[in-house]
Amino acid sequence: MSRSTRLDRVFYWLGLIVIAWAVLTFLLVPMLAALQAALFRLGSLAMFDAVSELARSRRVRAALWNTVWMTAATTLTVTIVGMFQVAVLEYFRVPGRGFLKIAFSTPLVFGGVVAAAGYNFTYGPSGAITAALAALFPSLPRDWFIGWFGVLFAHTFLMTSFHFLFLRAAMRRVDYSTIEAARSMGASEMTILRCVVLPVILPTVLAVTLLTLITAMGSFAAPQVLGGRDFHMLSQMVLTLNSLRRPDMAALLALLMGLVLMGLILLSQYFEAKGAYTAGAKATTRIQLRAIRNPLARIVVTALAYLLAAIYLMPVALIVLFSFAPASSIGIDVLPSSFTLANYARVLGGGAAFVPFFNSMLMSSIAVAVGLAITLFAVPIMVRKRNWLTRGLDICFVLPWIIPTMLLAVGLIVAFDAPNPLVGNLVLLGSYWLLPIGYVIFSLPLMVRFMRSAFIGIDPAFDEAARAMGASGPYRLRRVVLPLVAPTAILVAGMKFNNLLAEYPLSAFLYNVNNKPLPIAIVDGAVSADPDQAAVSLVYVTLIMAFSLAVILIAERLSLGRTPESSNL
């Protein structure tokens, strides 16, 4: 055995040991700790006692009812708006289709805590729209938007990204010749939509509806920012219980929510697979846009489409404009009367406003670098070798995608709130590093999924040719494999970096005064009455939107598209 081969084996086993330790310490142990906290107390089964305490709590019962009806209402309103968007973009001929497509795609760059803060700035007590309405209706309360209505409104217009991406793709698989055949037989437009188009796209509609339901049920940022004092959902109660030092009740509530969400995820995957099978290769004639012959219907559809476009674009435009406005104009002016770079100078100038931006940039960079290193080491092994170890790693890497973020966060808190021998008897809770560790775990599923596809797509002849010329394993990886997967790695790194900048649920559970990230600063600014803090928050939101747009443009350039995550609304 040559020296290089021995070194390869040493690095191989050393890397596997490190990854196995990381998976055990920061994924499996926290999950077991969360289960133990939910089910046991002082060594005995206490789940039923915790359930009884939760059931007796009026706030928990109210949050449960709010979650149930808000989830149902959101699913209904998002389905109506989303299907209308798809019909306007992919079925009917409406003027300005390109502009409407841009407007309807804004949830891809304007989601989660960024969008919740943006809607609060637009329609909240200090919002520009509220200022305009107050001038017209002086008796209008400044907090008219805060409460269940604001949450439902935000959900409705921020959760249509699944329809925009998946349902539009399903519409393109409809065979236009079947529509023409039905039309030639005298079928009306509504009959064609109901009897020809809908059966083809129905599995995708069901999958998208379930994804919307999952997102609405786990909504966190929207009720936190827009719900006010009287409207709370279960995700907020988990955070509240944890802050009250009741990790047992927090873990149990997160576990119950997780079980429901996992069941819905399995259902959505079933319908997604059925949709892919049903509409697989049927479309021989691409669907053509249909003109709306009835003049009144054409006017109504066009007006509704542009009204939706205005609703989507208004918060984005106002945020960008007011991020360049003096802080004194926020909450007073409908549109800024002057512009300044002072807000950006405060954020980027190295003062107190720069700290959350720096913290998020640093922690996101660390998380992406560590996650990418783990992925680039583990995925080639998982692709080449199929044994119990690689299958186990594969399952572990998918777990953070299935397990709700709140349950993962509670598990990390419970596992590391005391000296833990797996990390040298350190107490990580309250330290700088627990949040970056959570970011790494949160990032792994998407990284593994995309990089696996990239490695599977490599022609084995390249590696075999390098091996035949005597190249060692590390040399082949560095000079042959990595250049081939580099575009995907760059895209995935950019996507996760952008997601982590706006990751609110995990940050809300794990941050401390030493590493306060951007999402927490954005929420603080959104609910603050201080115009200076609100102005800084607008700069944060604008910078995150700029990063999101840059990632999408890179994705377009690399022709790899973009896959959406839970908006964590």
From Swiss-Prot:
Residues 64-268, 357-551 form the ABC transmembrane type-1 domain. Keywords: Cell inner membrane, Cell membrane, Membrane, Plasmid, Repeat, Transmembrane, Transmembrane helix, Transport. GO terms for cellular component: plasma membrane. It comes from the Bacteria. It is a multi-pass membrane protein. GO terms for biological process: transmembrane transport. The keyword Cell membrane applies. The chain crosses the membrane at residues 10-30, 68-88, 98-118, 121-141, 145-165, 196-216, 247-267, 304-324, 363-383, 395-415, 426-446, 480-500, 534-554. InterPro entries: MetI-like, MetI-like_sf. It is found in: Cell inner membrane. Probably part of the binding-protein-dependent transport system y4fNOP. Probably responsible for the translocation of the substrate across the membrane. Belongs to the binding-protein-dependent transport system permease family. CysTW subfamily. This is Probable ABC transporter permease protein y4fN. It comes from Sinorhizobium fredii (strain NBRC 101917 / NGR234).
